[in-house]
Curated annotation (Swiss-Prot):
<dbReference type="GO" id="GO:0016567">
    <property type="term" value="P:protein ubiquitination"/>
</dbReference>
<dbReference type="Pfam" id="PF06803">
    <property type="entry name" value="DUF1232"/>
</dbReference>
<keyword id="KW-0256">Endoplasmic reticulum</keyword>
<keyword id="KW-1133">Transmembrane helix</keyword>
<keyword id="KW-0472">Membrane</keyword>
<feature type="topological domain" description="Lumenal">
    <location>
        <position position="222"/>
    </location>
</feature>
<keyword id="KW-0479">Metal-binding</keyword>
<dbReference type="InterPro" id="IPR027370">
    <property type="entry name" value="Znf-RING_euk"/>
</dbReference>
<keyword id="KW-0862">Zinc</keyword>
<feature type="topological domain" description="Cytoplasmic">
    <location>
        <begin position="244"/>
        <end position="257"/>
    </location>
</feature>
<dbReference type="InterPro" id="IPR017907">
    <property type="entry name" value="Znf_RING_CS"/>
</dbReference>
<feature type="transmembrane region" description="Helical">
    <location>
        <begin position="223"/>
        <end position="243"/>
    </location>
</feature>
<keyword id="KW-0812">Transmembrane</keyword>
<dbReference type="GO" id="GO:0061630">
    <property type="term" value="F:ubiquitin protein ligase activity"/>
</dbReference>
<feature type="topological domain" description="Cytoplasmic">
    <location>
        <begin position="46"/>
        <end position="200"/>
    </location>
</feature>
<keyword id="KW-0808">Transferase</keyword>
<dbReference type="Pfam" id="PF13445">
    <property type="entry name" value="zf-RING_UBOX"/>
</dbReference>
């Protein structure tokens, strides 16, 4: 009777897998996903050390001395906008802080004085990382204080002159963390981005999600295994760059309203 029984198909498990019953390729894909997401979160929330680049130390020192000489009376206690946030130019707590497109923060008056020091012909390089500064993001709201209004006007004038400069692919990648952080912050804030831009971001994210879950891939995972997952990450990366480009265009258009 046993001889008449049909032989049941036997599917052997991966004997050399790290976790029994789970393919090593699945484990690698999951780990890479966590690494990619963790790296993106780190880039969006990072707070780099505010160390002046050696090539800019002389210029920063001159600007610091100039600001100290112009200050006739002792400065009042400055409000602390961030934990342990010190402007690397004046070495004090940042007041009316301004963030560059490379993600470094300065006092609004300090970065404007740094720009004015010397020639005004072109965009400045960040005193910390030497990246070209094409956008200044004021991190304070409009107030009745004259100093705040002057800084907002100076930052707006700077952005009008340099925000539309051509950007290389490497520059766009380096600007990605800061632009995405500001874009998503405004997306979920009242009175932030206009609705058409929010809809475009949502549609882009939905398109990326559909591509990730779709069985139709440029490099199918069924044939190429772990290599087939790389095209999904590449599409997601291109999507983030596209969102940052759209947000830069929105910021530039605001300057001419």
């Amino acid at each position: 009777m046993a001889d008449n029984q049909e032989e049941r198909p036997h599917f052997p498990l991966d004997e050399g897998s790290i976790i029994e019953g789970v393919s090593d390729q699945v484990i690698v894909v999951v780990l890479l996903s966590f690494v990619a997401v963790g790296s993106l979160i780190y880039l969006l929330l990072r707070n780099d050390e505010q160390n002046i680049h050696p090539e800019n130390q002389d210029r920063v020192r001159a600007v610091r001395e100039q600001l100290q000489n112009e200050q006739e009376t002792p400065a009042p206690p400055r409000p602390q906008f961030y934990s342990d946030m010190t402007c690397p130019v004046c070495l004090q707590q940042a007041t009316f802080p301004v963030e560059t497109n490379c993600g470094h923060l300065f006092c609004g008056s300090c970065i404007i004085a740094y720009w004015r020091y010397g020639t005004w012909l072109g965009a400045i390089n960040c005193p910390i990382c030497r990246q070209t500064v094409t956008l200044l993001f004021p991190l304070f709201g409009a107030t009745d204080q004259e100093d705040a209004q002057n800084i907002l006007q100076e930052a707006t004038g700077y952005n009008r002159r340099f925000s539309g400069q051509p950007r290389s692919l490497m520059d766009r990648i380096m600007d990605l963390p800061t632009l995405l952080r500001h874009a998503f912050r405004e997306m979920f804030s009242v009175g932030g981005l206009f609705w058409m831009f929010r809809i475009r971001i949502v549609l882009c994210l939905l398109g990326a999600l559909l591509y990730l879950v779709s069985p139709l891939d440029i490099i199918p995972e069924a044939l190429f295994g772990i290599l087939g997952f790389l095209d999904d990450l590449f599409v997601l990366f291109l999507l983030l760059i596209y969102i940052s480009i759209m947000y830069r265009e929105v910021v530039t258009q605001r300057l001419y309203r």
